[in-house]
Regions:
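Catalytic alpha/beta core domains of metabolic enzymes, predominantly
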Residues: 1-79
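Active-site or pore-adjacent capping/gating segments
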Residues: 89-142
């Protein structure tokens, strides 16, 4: 975020999520899935995993509030859940400004951020964190 102009800071993850939600809607609200649904197929939900805020300059409920939307699930750290219970607002915001998501992401890339590389790194790091958490859980039950 530090590489970005102030007006773009804190917007990358939210707009990547909005773009993912648009892609999700195209798949599960499209003709191809409608045919499957007619035969009993159930849609999936999008999972936003561990959406705690690490930057102290942002609201501690920024991600949980911005990612509330239909057919989504959000897992959050305990501290984020406590903060949301205390002062969060439960309202669907995921689709707010969703049509501008691609524009904002293009601006992010124009400022030197390679979103594909960033996504690969975040997926790798996130997967490693889940592996470590799972291993700790297994150690507890051994």
């Amino acid at each position: 975020d530090e590489k970005l102009p102030v007006e773009l800071q804190g917007k990358t993850a939210i707009n990547l999520s909005r773009q993912a939600y648009l892609d999700y809607q195209k798949i599960f609200n499209g003709e191809r899935f409608a045919a499957l649904k007619a035969h009993g197929a159930k849609g999936q939900y999008l999972l936003w995993a561990s959406t705690g805020v690490k930057n102290k300059n942002y609201s501690d409920v920024m991600y949980i509030e911005e990612l509330i939307g239909e057919e989504t699930i959000n897992t959050v750290p305990d501290a984020t859940l406590d903060a949301f219970r205390d002062h969060g607002v439960a309202a669907s915001r995921l689709t707010n400004g969703i049509q501008n998501a691609s524009v904002i992401l293009a601006q992010v890339e124009a400022n030197g951020i390679n979103l594909h590389e960033l996504g690969e790194k975040l997926q790798k790091d996130g997967l490693q964190q889940f592996v470590e958490a799972f291993d700790k859980l297994l150690d507890l039950v051994k």
